[in-house]
């Protein structure tokens, strides 16, 4: 018979008790399960993971802008495979349509809305969603020009405007009328024109600026078609265009030059959870709220964040290389009338 030291027996029993305690806690509380990864437990007891204290299954719908939709769909598929009682579905929603589609009077509202940027949430106003939320990715505007165009290596709002003014044949592609990208474009143009990163409604409504911008926009042959598509035609339909940085990987890079505006607007994609589920019971509403928070945590994890680069996007909180434009609520309202 082996004469095991008493201290070893004590430590072994303590280890067993701690292991059992962590296992039981992980089966009961989601917060513990996050840090107590146990593949065997998940295999043997998958149904014991309860998204709420009531153990109610939750299916949530996440509305994402087209720029982010493919990434969110991939993340949702991975999340669904790892969770037994939570299922995440994804739909597409442009910020320009959010005010109409997310109105409190509309039935079957998505449980989460990922807006393009914080200013989009401000522009929509009274919808039943949080006023702010964690950023899950990042994007921004970028100028792209045909390598042989007149703008050469100097690519900016001013150089494009000067080229359009000096050559009647110079053509530019800009974001569609009434789009969120158009609002961001107006803010970027105004900031560069005034050399001012902190925009006000007065700066956006300045007559001299608006006249200068209208002259530039007169060189845009098609303001309803995506600028990426106009640049991607063979040959390109325009000499220069303003796109999102995530569109850059879809172009033949060797044929173009690329430069973010000196004053850029960040698309930070805030994750906004519904503030009420008036059509559901309290338990069902709580289950959806917790499921939405779980998916938010998942999107901010290393796996999904590491895949953003595959979609031409940057990680949440990436450090910008240029000045970032900021604007208050009156400036946001002025932006809505700017890009028409």
Locate the predicted segments by residue:
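N-terminal segment of the mature folded domain
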Residues: 7-28, 33-178
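Short beta-strand->loop
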Residues: 63-65, 146, 164-205, 213-217
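Stable alpha-helical elements in mature extracytoplasmic
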Residues: 68-75, 94, 98, 113-123, ...
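Periplasmic-binding protein-like
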Residues: 133-142, 207-216, 252-284, 288-290
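Short helix-loop capping/hinge motifs at secondary-structure junctions, enriched
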Residues: 148-155, 191-199, 277-292
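Ligand-binding pocket segment of bilobal, Venus flytrap-like solute-binding proteins
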Residues: 191-260
């Amino acid at each position: 018979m082996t004469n095991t030291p008493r201290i070893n027996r004590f430590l072994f029993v303590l280890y067993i008790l701690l292991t059992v305690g962590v296992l039981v806690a992980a089966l009961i509380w989601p917060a513990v399960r996050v840090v107590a990864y146990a593949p065997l437990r998940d295999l043997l007891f998958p149904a014991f993971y309860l998204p709420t204290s009531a153990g109610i299954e939750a299916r949530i719908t996440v509305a994402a802008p087209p720029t982010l939709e493919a990434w969110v769909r991939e993340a949702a598929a991975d999340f669904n495979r790892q969770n037994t009682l939570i299922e995440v579905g994804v739909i597409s929603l442009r910020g320009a349509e959010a005010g109409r589609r997310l109105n409190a009077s509309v039935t079957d509202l998505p449980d989460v809305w990922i807006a393009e940027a914080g200013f989009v949430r401000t522009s929509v106003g009274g919808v039943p969603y949080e006023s702010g939320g964690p950023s899950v990715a990042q994007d921004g505007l970028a100028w792209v020009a045909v390598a042989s165009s007149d703008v050469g290596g100097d690519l900016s709002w001013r150089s494009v405007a000067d080229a359009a003014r000096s050559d009647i044949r110079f053509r530019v592609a800009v974001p569609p009328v009434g789009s969120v990208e158009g609002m961001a474009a107006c803010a970027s143009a105004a900031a560069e024109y005034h050399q001012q990163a902190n925009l006000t409604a007065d700066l956006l409504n300045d007559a001299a600026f608006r006249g200068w911008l209208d002259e530039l926009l007169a060189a845009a042959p098609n303001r309803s078609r995506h600028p990426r598509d106009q640049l991607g035609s063979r040959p390109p339909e325009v000499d220069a265009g303003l796109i999102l940085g995530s569109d850059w990987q879809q172009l033949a890079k060797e044929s173009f030059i690329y430069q973010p505006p000196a004053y850029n607007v960040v698309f930070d994609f805030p994750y906004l959870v519904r503030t009420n589920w008036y059509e559901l019971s309290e338990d069902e509403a709580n289950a959806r709220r917790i499921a939405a928070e779980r998916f938010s945590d998942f999107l901010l994890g290393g796996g999904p964040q590491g895949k953003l680069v595959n979609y031409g996007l940057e990680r949440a909180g990436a450090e910008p290389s240029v000045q970032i434009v900021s604007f208050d609520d009156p400036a946001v309202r002025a932006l809505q009338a700017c890009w028409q």
